[in-house]
Design a protein with these regions (language model features):
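Alpha4-beta5-alpha5 "output face"
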Residues: 1-5
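Intrinsically disordered, low-complexity protein-interaction/activation regions
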Residues: 16-22, 26-171
């Protein structure tokens, strides 16, 4: 049946009964409940969605910090590494203090949508838990699906390294 090629969540054939409709609705509800609470789009420009709504951050650097942690795919990074990435090789102490403000803002933004457990701290290392995100980049790494079309977090210069690796892998 051609409709299955559309990757539909369900399909009803005539004659349709109320029971058939209810089965399909329950199936869709089950799919939605199994979805991860945060959706992250890395290909193109970086965006974050919570329950279908774009997540807003108090500061643009907070969003960039979250993008950097997503790019690291669960690997822990230090405040110094974050400072070098976000301020392009400027290890100014003032920036390191500002990073702690960004961490607070990130925690508050995640708490506001009930997903604060995504952000993790282990001694001096900060990371996110990739298992709690629905992320196009992570999906691409797992499955190799051709979702990458040349742009990766295009608003951040530090993401060019990952973009280059994705291009290399593509060819």
């Amino acid at each position: 049946i051609p409709a299955f090629k559309l990757h539909a969540s369900g399909y009803l054939m005539k004659p349709v009964s109320a029971k058939d409709v209810q089965v399909e609705i329950d199936n869709i509800k089950g799919i939605r409940q199994n979805q991860k609470p945060l959706t992250v789009k890395c290909f193109g420009t970086f965006e974050v969605y919570a329950k279908g709504e774009k997540l807003t951050f108090k500061r643009s650097k907070t969003k960039e910090l979250f993008a950097f942690l997503v790019d690291r795919n669960g690997a822990g990074v230090t405040v110094a590494e974050i400072g070098v990435a976000l301020w392009e090789n400027d290890e100014d102490q003032k920036n390191q203090n500002y990073i702690h403000q960004l961490f607070r803002d990130l925690r508050q933004s995640l708490e506001a949508v009930g997903v604060e457990e995504i952000f993790e701290r282990n001694n001096y290392f900060y990371s996110i838990n990739p298992e709690k995100l629905d992320c196009d980049y992570y999906e691409h790494l797992k499955t190799g699906k051709p979702e990458f079309h040349g742009e990766y977090m295009s608003q951040y210069s530090w993401a060019e390294e990952t973009c280059g690796l994705l291009w290399k892998k593509r060819t």
